[in-house]
A protein has these predicted regions:
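Helix-coil-helix junctions within alpha-helical repeat/solenoid scaffolds
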Residues: 1-131
């Protein structure tokens, strides 16, 4: 349930509320949990979303990279696309030099996967981020 709450707050632009849950996301990772059966979301993805909401950019980058490595090793195409989209959202928020270009690359890769899988709502969300 924690993953759904963090992701929900992030998507509803309630980032401060998602950020408050970052310590719980770290606690979840410390249990050794890698994937959540209720959502198939990786715990590192959840922590990345919460860290990004807290503007803890370095931690978010680390979580997203770890999550992407895990998603590629499983492999989980959907989670790879989701990680790329959430990572891109973080980069757009951070807005340091080069972030927008990297975000566009990540979003383009996510868009390709969403199109391949057939996820119209995710295609729309990703296209909106690209605009």
């Amino acid at each position: 349930m924690l993953a759904n709450v963090i992701e929900g707050f992030a998507m509803l632009d309630e980032r401060s509320r998602a950020a408050e849950l970052y310590p719980l996301a770290l606690e979840l990772i410390s249990t050794g949990a890698v994937s959540l059966w209720t959502s198939a979301r990786l715990t590192q993805t959840v922590a990345g979303i919460a860290a990004a909401a807290a503007h803890n950019w370095e931690a978010a980058e680390d979580h997203f990279q770890t999550a992407l490595n895990q998603a590629e090793s499983f492999p989980s195409l959907l989670e790879q696309a989701e990680i790329r989209r959430f990572h891109a959202m973080m980069l757009i928020d951070r807005a340091t030099p080069g972030d927008r270009k990297t975000a566009r690359t990540l979003l383009s890769e996510a868009l390709e996967t969403y199109t391949q899988i057939g996820m119209p709502r995710h295609i729309e969300m990703t296209q909106n981020l690209l605009d």
